[in-house]
Amino acid sequence: GMMMLPTELTLRTTKDGIRLVNVPVKEVESLCKPLRSWRSLSSDEANRHLKEFYDADCLRIKTTIKLSHATDAGFNLFGQRMIGYDMNSNTLNGRFYSPQDPTSMELSADIYIDRTSIEVFIDGGLYSYSMERRPDTNNREGFHFWGNRIEVKDLQVFSVESIW
């Protein structure tokens, strides 16, 4: 089984009406220590910056990606797709998702990674999901942003302190 972050469900008024939002409880912030932060990167630059974190057990990564020429883009960890956004079909990892402002062509993610699980909170918690961490043992890419000429507008990496 997986241990999940404690989260808080709230209602938020959006341009499309009231929506249910799921975010980690605020106490989780006290476990996170900022390590690195960058802005306006190409996917290749972002991938290079993240190399130093390939072997980390517990990380938090906050990022915003902007699709300009790509119709799909995402973020993998050793071949495992953490984010796969298809703008044409409005899907995120194969499930329907439409951003609040589809014309912005941006997607923000707050990703918590530990030894056994990955939890992702999209666009401030409007969409969230978790998965078992299952890296491809033959994959050496580590963290890998993908998509035709995407911009990684913001990339922040945090260490996450264990509570055990």
Regions inferred by a protein language model and the residue ranges of each:
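Beta-rich accessory regions
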Residues: 1-164
